[in-house]
Amino acid sequence: MGALTPQECAGLARRAALSRAAVLSPAGESESVVLWEDEDSVAWLNVAHDSRDTGFHDHDGSAVGVYVIAGGVTNEGLPADGTRRVRRYRAGDSFWVPGSGIHRMDHETGAVTVHVYSPPLRAIGYYEVVDGLLQRTLGPPDEPSPASPRLLATLRDADTAAPDRSLSPA
C-alpha cells in the first residue's frame, strides 16, 4: 500500500477511536499504548493525566493524523512568516500535520487522543533556541518530547513587538 497521506492518517485515527475500546489507568503519569503497527502506519492511543506541552517537534518525515476522543488539545505550527496559528480541538475533532511539519501540542488534563503516523514513526526532532539559533535534536519516538521554553518565549516576544499580529482563533 505505501505511505498514507496526512488526511488518510486523520481518517484512520478517527476510525480507530470509534471502533476500538482501549482503557488506560485513570491516574498517574501520561501514557501511550500502541494500537497497531504495520509497514504503512503505526497508531498510538495517548492519555494526558496532567496538562502537557510537547514542545515544537517534527516526526522525521512521518505524516500524522490526530483524533481527539476526550478533553481538548491545542496545536500550533512553527510559523515561518511570524504569524502564530494556534488551533484548539475538542472531542470529536481531528486534524493532521504533514511529514515536513513542525508543531507543538498542548494537551489539557484528561485529554485522550489517537495518533496515526505514516510511514511508521522512527524518530522525533525536537526544536529549541540555543545561543540565539534554532536547533534540532533527534530523539526516539517512544519518549515524551521536551517543551521548547526559549523558542516559545521568542515567539511570544515577537507577538509583543508586533501588536498588529494576533493568535488565530480556533
Q: How should these model regions be labeled?
A:
Residues 40, 46-47, 57, 78, ...:
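Feature captures hydrophobic
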Residues 108-157:
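Double-stranded beta-helix
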